[in-house]
Amino acid sequence: MPMPRFFRSFALCLALVCASLLVTAQPAEAKVKVSFHSFNGSVVFGRYPHTFVVFEGTLDETGQAINENFGFTAKTVTPAILSGPVAHMIWVEEPKWIGKTNRHFTLTVDDAMYRKMRAEVEAWRNAPGKYYDLDNRNCIHFVGKIAQLGGLKVDYPKDLLRKPRSWLNRVTSLNPQLGAKAIGGKN
């Protein structure tokens, strides 16, 4: 028994709509968020003020989940830090500490930029010799380089080189397009 004309037209329209959805439906573009954090320091826990970056998201090309963080510091904290370059390391924060830090702002980057930023992390990790310098290559300079790769304006005023929160607040003010607000408190 032939299908009534109305049902044939309806079935054809439904098939066309479904086909167009299949053709135009694309997977959501995966991105990695890069958050810029500062830690105020804690006399109780023996921690100095610090700044670091957190990468979270999914790579578009592979679907790989990303959840990692990196900061730059001296391998050992001794008075030698005050007199010039010392041995360095990339510091990875424990997850329990990240929630207790200040998240200043977040950038969203594509796979290519994520790879550039990670290459920069590895360049600092594998720099030869004594690479950490309290006044010239500390955690602020490391995070600043990551921010610059992300297209942000960065500077390093001498009076902020040992004040990560204040320095990230300055980066926030230099980049109003972020829509971020300064984080208050001492440091």
Where are these regions (language model features)?
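Bacterial N-terminal signal peptides that target proteins for export
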Residues: 2-14
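A generic secondary-structure boundary signal that marks alpha-helix termini
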Residues: 20, 61, 148-152
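A structural motif
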Residues: 107-120
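Second-shell loop/turn segments in exported
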Residues: 39-43, 101-110, 125-133
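C-terminal segment of classical bacterial N-terminal signal peptides
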Residues: 17-27
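Glycine-rich catalytic cores of cysteine/serine-nucleophile enzymes that process amide/ester linkages
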Residues: 30-103
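Activation targets extended, charge/polar-rich intrinsically disordered C-terminal tails
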Residues: 32, 119-187
